[in-house]
Structures are given as structure tokens and as C-alpha cells.
């Protein structure tokens, strides 16, 4: 069996809560997952000081557990890159957009982590204000994401190189399932993305962004996909929901997702669980 602790939206900066971050760290030590997956929004305002704190937190976890992390929309310098996106200097715009993430976290926006029993392919969906993320609503500018062909190709390559018996997991930032409280999808191309991930053999999608914990099963390309949406570790909770993270457990027969919710003074404790049969022919 492989265990993946899935957290999201840490939002280092004013929304970060030290006691919750400490409890998350304690849970990682106690649960001893094979991997920790952080699906973006490490910072609140993409500030250098916030990235420094986020990096220190990730390094602390990495001393004992492998970590895979991707950027979220709050980690992108999207506002300052608007003019650059409209210019001919596309490469310069790209480098500016992710410059602080590259400096403090990683040069890789689509990282891959393989552990015994699973491969986690990061797929960047946080592109700031870009053509693929545009919708008809002004409020979506810089907030909504999309799955690009380039990033999808990297997922395909990661799965092709992975062990045949490894569970295929994709990690994105933006939620492909409409939030119960927000009523919004996080992706501009949700349907296409889900079909593409299913066609590549993915069994599980990890995401965040919506600040609302959720677990869904969807049918795409004649295959079932499980979507684990982690809540936020910060105080930027939605509609009175509790801060939370998800623990994923995958064995030969089942894929289980347990939500751990914040309780004061106990810390993060199990609150609900979901179980799904594995895709036919899959092993872990």
C-alpha cells in the first residue's frame, strides 16, 4: 500500500496559521506517508518573504518525506506580466511570471515523484493571465487556470517512464469539479482536461484552489477518475468550513481518501472517508 498526504493552499503570509502548520507537520510524522503532495498556492501575495517561509517549511518536511509541489495562481506574478503577455517577448513573460517560484521553490513547474506503488505527475495549471485561461467573466482573470498541451505532454512522458504497476496520479492546482460553495470550476478547459488525464491512464487527480475539501468520482473515457480536492491549511476558509488536508491510501483493490479537519485544540483529526475500487488491471 502507498500513502500520499495531500495538502494545498498553505498561503504563507498573513493567512498562514502557525499552529495549523505545526499540526500538519506532526501529522506527517505520525502518518508516515510515502509522499507529501502540495498542490499550489504556497503564498498569499507572491512575495519574496512568503516564498522564503514556504521553502523553509517544505525543506523541513523533506528531511523525512519526499515532497512534490506545484505552483498555484497566488504564486504567479500575473499582474505585472500583463503587458509582457501582449508583447512579442513570450519567453521573457514566462520567466517573469514564475521568477519568484523558480528562485525559491523549483525551476520545474511540472515535477514528477515516483515512490513504490505510485507516480505523481505535477501538471502546472497556473498560467496567470493567458489566452488558454480566459473566460467571459472579468473576475476570472488571473484566477482561473487551464491544462496546456505542453504540460499534458509532460504528464504523458512521466507515466510512460513509470513502473507498470504504479498508480498513475496527476496533481494540478485548479479544481476541475465545481465547488459546492463557490459554484465555480477552477479550469477553463475542465472537460478536455479530464478526458485527457483519463486517456493517459490516470486514476487519481489531486487539486486544491477552491478552499473546500471534496472527493469525487467521475467517469471519463470509459474509466473512473477519483478527484481529491484538498481544503486550505490557512485561515482563508470558505463558508465556515474547517481547514483540512486529505490522506490518500492506495492498495491492490481500493483507493481511499480520508479528510483530516482542523479541531482546536486537538489539531487535524480524521473527519470523513471515501473508498473506491481500483481501475481494472491496476495494481499497487
Identify the residue ranges that each predicted region occupies.
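N-terminal active-site segment of His-dependent metallophosphoesterases
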Residues: 1-64, 144, 150, 157
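Active-site-proximal beta-strand elements of phosphoester/diester hydrolases
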Residues: 2-11, 117-133, 169-171, 225-232
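Active-site neighborhood of phospho(di)ester-bond hydrolases with catalytic His/Asp-centered motifs
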Residues: 7-8, 36-41, 66-73, 169-173, ...
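Active-site environment of divalent metal-dependent phosphoester hydrolases
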Residues: 13-16, 44-49, 53, 73-81, ...
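Extended active-site neighborhood of metal-dependent phosphoesterases/phosphodiesterases
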Residues: 53-157, 162, 196-198, 221-223, ...
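Active-site-proximal segments of metal-dependent phosphoesterases and phosphodiesterases across multiple
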Residues: 130-146, 153, 161-204, 210
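Conserved beta-sheet core of the metallophosphoesterase superfamily
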Residues: 182-253
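A short C-terminal boundary segment appended to hydrolase-like catalytic domains
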Residues: 249-284
Amino acid at each position: 500500500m502507498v500513502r500520499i498526504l495531500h495538502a494545498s493552499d498553505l498561503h504563507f503570509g498573513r493567512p498562514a496559521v502557525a499552529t495549523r502548520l505545526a499540526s500538519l507537520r506532526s501529522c506527517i510524522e505520525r502518518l508516515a506517508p510515502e509522499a507529501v503532495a502540495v498542490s499550489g498556492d504556497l503564498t498569499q501575495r507572491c512575495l519574496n518573504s512568503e516564498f522564503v517561509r514556504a521553502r523553509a517549511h517544505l525543506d523541513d518536511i523533506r528531511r523525512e518525506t519526499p515532497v512534490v509541489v506545484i505552483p498555484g495562481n497566488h504564486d504567479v506574478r500575473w499582474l505585472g506580466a500583463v503587458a509582457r503577455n501582449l508583447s512579442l517577448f513570450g519567453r521573457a513573460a514566462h520567466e517573469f511570471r514564475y521568477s519568484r517560484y523558480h528562485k525559491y521553490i523549483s525551476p520545474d513547474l511540472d515535477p514528477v515523484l515516483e515512490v513504490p506503488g505510485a507516480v505523481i505527475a505535477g501538471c502546472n495549471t497556473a498560467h496567470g493571465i493567458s489566452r488558454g485561461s480566459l473566460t467571459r467573466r472579468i473576475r476570472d482573470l488571473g484566477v482561473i487556470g487551464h491544462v496546456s498541451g505542453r504540460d499534458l505532454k509532460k504528464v504523458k512522458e512521466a507515466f510512460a517512464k513509470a513502473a507498470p504497476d504504479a498508480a498513475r496520479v496527476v496533481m494540478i492546482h485548479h479544481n476541475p469539479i465545481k465547488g459546492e460553495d463557490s459554484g465555480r470550476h477552477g479550469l477553463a478547459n475542465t472537460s478536455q482536461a479530464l478526458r485527457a488525464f483519463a486517456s493517459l491512464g490516470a486514476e487519481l487527480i489531486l487539486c486544491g484552489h477552491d478552499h473546500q475539501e471534496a472527493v469525487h468520482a467521475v467517469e471519463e473515457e470509459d474509466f473512473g477518475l477519483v478527484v481529491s480536492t484538498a481544503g486550505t491549511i490557512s485561515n482563508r476558509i470558505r463558508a465556515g468550513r474547517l481547514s483540512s488536508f486529505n490522506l490518500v491510501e492506495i492498495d491492490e483493490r481500493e483507493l481511499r481518501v480520508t479528510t483530516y479537519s482542523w479541531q482546536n485544540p486537538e489539531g487535524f483529526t480524521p473527519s470523513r472517508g471515501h473508498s473506491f475500487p481500483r481501475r481494472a488491471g491496476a495494481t499497487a
